[in-house]
Amino acid sequence: MALDAVVEDILATSKSKVAEINAETEQEVARILSEARERAAEIKSRKEAEAKHDIEALVRREMSSANLELKRAELNVHKEVLEQVRIKFLDAVTNLPKDKNEALIKKLLEPYDLKDMKVYSSKRDQAFVSSLVPNYGGTLDIIGGVVVESKDGSVRFDHSYETLARDIFNAKVKEVSKLLFG
């Protein structure tokens, strides 16, 4: 019977050791699982934050792009309207009544000592301008106004209606735009 007691003692010790090893293993498994869950939660949280940030950045880029496109379209409409205003202005200047056209041409010639200059005009204004100036240079392809040039051609002052309209328009484009579009 002593052998049975030894066997039972060994079995009891073995069961105790197995139970102890199982308990340690379960604790180790629980610790590893807990750490894995924590890391998974951290990774998930980080990835969600990255995804949220990426989505917000994408939305900002898309909004910025859409706003830029809208401003471009708006600018194109403004340019078209301003061009229509410029064309109407040129049309109005082209169709000035004869007396107003002649008065404007005289005003354009006032600052110059015409005996030392050649003056060019449109074909329409040829008779009037040639009667005003001692050195008529001929006609140019302009809608109206005059071009004054030194006799040697080194200095030229372009007072054609097209150039005056362009210069006035360029100088006043901000004001015109503000009046038209607020």
Curated annotation (Swiss-Prot):
It is found in: Cell membrane. InterPro entries: ATPase_V1_Esu (IPR002842). Its main location: membrane. It holds the Pfam family vATP-synt_E. NCBIfam families: PRK02292.1. Has multiple subunits with at least A(3), B(3), C, D, E, F, H, I and proteolipid K(x). Belongs to the V-ATPase E subunit family. This is A-type ATP synthase subunit E. The gene is atpE.
